[in-house]
Amino acid sequence: MVMSVINWFEDRQKFGGLIGAFLEEATRSSMTNERDRRISVNANKGLWARCDNCGNMLYVKFLKQNRSVCEECGYHLSMSSMERIELLIDPNTWIPLDEDMSARDILSFSDEDSYETRILLSQEKTGLTDAVQTGIGYLNGTLIALGVMDFHFMGGSMGSVVGEKITRLIEYATQRLLPLVLICASGGARMQEGTLSLMQMAKISSVLQLYQVQNKLLYISVLTYPTTGGVTASFGMLGDIIIAEPKAYIAFAGKRVIEQTLRQKIPDGFQAAESLFDNGLLDLIVPRNLLKGVLSEISGLYLSVPYNKN
Amino acid sequence: MASAVLPQSNSLTSAKCSLVSPSRNSNLNKVGVEASGEFLRLQSSKNGVNQSLHFGLVLRVGQEDGRGCRKPRKTTAMLKKGGRKTPDKEYPWPQKMKPEDLMGSPLRFLSRFKPLPQKPKPVHLPFELPLVDIQKKIQEVRELANSTGMDFSIQLNELQEKYDEVRRDLYSQLSPVQRLSVARHPNRPTCLDHVLNITDKWLELHGDRAGYDDPAIITGIGQIEGMSFMFIGHQKGRNTKENIYRNFAMPTPNGYRKALRMMQHAAHHGFPILTFVDTPGAYAGIQAEERGQGEAIARNLREMFGLRVPIITTVIGEGGSGGALAIGCCDKMLMLENSVYYVASPEACAAILWKTAAAAPQATEALKITAHELVKLDVVDEIIPEPLGGAHSDPLTTSMNMKTVIMKHMRELLKMEPDPLLAQRVAKFRKIGSYQEGVKVDPRFKRNMKPRDAPMEMGEPKLLPSHVHQNLELSLKTASTAATTSE
């Protein structure tokens, strides 16, 4: 089936645009799931995606089935937050929190566009209210609190809404004694909210102090491509266990900033997950297809501690 | 002096000598050989310098000086013996101490931060040009008065009044861009300048006990009004040489770990913590990343909310993002009038959002980084006034103003018990942030958010009223009742 579709694709070049249009229509109607259609249309305006690592053409439908991992080289392509929730949470157990929270233009910030316009455009384009989805659900039978950041919304930048949603999630987990998993993907702090974004780092770290240190609960952070700036310098690196995806870009200062400071070229793979692992900054590198199992095994190990007398 | 051919010596040495290359062997025969135990010492006939032959490897290869004798290169050993002495590391105490010196507090001999030998050159910021012109005119009139002997005092007084008026006008209405340039002024008093002005005694402590003493962060114990406090701050240099030594107040992970060690030490013993923020940001370098710059900052952020002593942070210059926040999670945040606190430097922000670094002034206006704007956003608790002309024109008055405000807040915080103090610190940061909720959102804007698919039996997740606030109210109530009953 795959081979014939590839042949069709090649033939499309020969026969021209009209048959190409027909092809999309034909395959589009065969997709039963409403969601699938939206996502495939969003992804590169077509049915094919290109792997960033090996340059291979990947059929989007099969790519999604394979959890956005390239079949040829195993490279982990970016994954939307909805897909990540479906990857980790057992079906029919998800309860989202604070779905309707959205950002406010407190500083009346306006660069080329006003901040308000940018928020509305991003919400329209990505179908997300802000850069994080939080909620609770069962992971292999254990109820966990899960927060997933999404890089598609304004580069995953952390503003007041991200700070507030994650803080409320951690407070809920503290009250209900749930393990916490935060999946991080961010370009840094949201500059349009100024110093308020900076204080979100402190806010989340303060509730993590109550959660981890005073209440001794388990927090696992999963760092995905890319995790930079304020998130690395706050909750990303505070997990009891820090897991990274293979070849994820994890940094505090961006590559360009370091090159400007030092005026020299940075070696390749400098801020990749493997390099951080060698420098002792991560606990584990876990591929996506094993992630759910590993998370449930880890929480099982922490629940069966025999000497809980402290 | 045995002029023995080397292979004839005992088996131990011969085994080692065989490693020496044949070309050098011929030369070695011409110098004296003294076999002594484990290794041979080759003594040049010229000047008695030893060239040790460890396991057959010649360590120093000198040049032949024509007569076939090898001339050894000067080694450090040689320097120490005869000729020029290598200078000792400079110590902060005088070489020869007089008995009078030992009378007062010995702590002043331990501080390496001495006043600069020359007064720093005055630097004029771009917006101060009118003042510079008037100053020049005053100078000209004075010279004229001196050279001709005529009385120009009326003109001088007029010019002086004009100077004061223009200065007052300029400095009472500074724009954010102007305040940023004052915050970055090269002669602005540094952390140690302020600390030495406000403390009666000062003892600087060093090191992160794990490999490095970062000069960009200053830690130490100081005494004000008979009470000891722990001081931590970013230290900029007062001139270019110092700035390079201090790395322009950009700390490495070691600096943050040093600060954390000191803060935990302070909480352990009961020193309240005073921190001073003055940094362009954390150092962005390869080694800093490899050693975990993000992790060091994150750990500081989390641990500061668990320290059971009062913490007051004062921003004395520029507060650069995470690098500043890592020592800035406090009970009370104070800022000097002309200091700034930003999430990203205006230049970086302009380059990213406006796509050109030339838009830095617009970025400065838009980001709302000055003290007055941050008080409105409820991030900063109080502004410390600076004398007219900026802190660099009168450092002592600035330090005294700072001392008054810090001690006022400290006296309030010292009355609190640890648990309500921690709860209040968390509450201070908990309320920062601006969002909207409860407003109906267009379903198109939520189409990629996973809706609820759990059965109704799982219930409705209701967050109980934040237990932080509950604990805070409870502790404040118990504290106040305890106070009233004790009276």
Curated annotation (Swiss-Prot), chain A:
Plastid keyword on record: yes
Molecular-function annotations in GO: acetyl-CoA carboxylase activity; ATP binding; carboxyl- or carbamoyltransferase activity; zinc ion binding
Cofactor binding note from Swiss-Prot or TrEMBL: Binds 1 zinc ion per subunit.
UniProt entry tagged with the keyword Nucleotide-binding: yes
Gene3D superfamilies found in the cross-reference section: 2-enoyl-CoA Hydratase, Chain A, domain 1
Species: Adiantum capillus-veneris (Maidenhair fern)
Protein's name according to its UniProt entry: Acetyl-coenzyme A carboxylase carboxyl transferase subunit beta, chloroplastic
Residues reported in the UniProt entry to bind Zn(2+): C51, C54, C70, C73
E.C. designation(s): 2.1.3.15
Catalytic activity line of the entry: N(6)-carboxybiotinyl-L-lysyl-[protein] + acetyl-CoA = N(6)-biotinyl-L-lysyl-[protein] + malonyl-CoA
GO-annotated cellular components: acetyl-CoA carboxylase complex; chloroplast stroma
Gene field: accD
Principal subcellular localization: plastid
Cofactor names: Zn(2+)
Family according to the record: Belongs to the AccD/PCCB family.
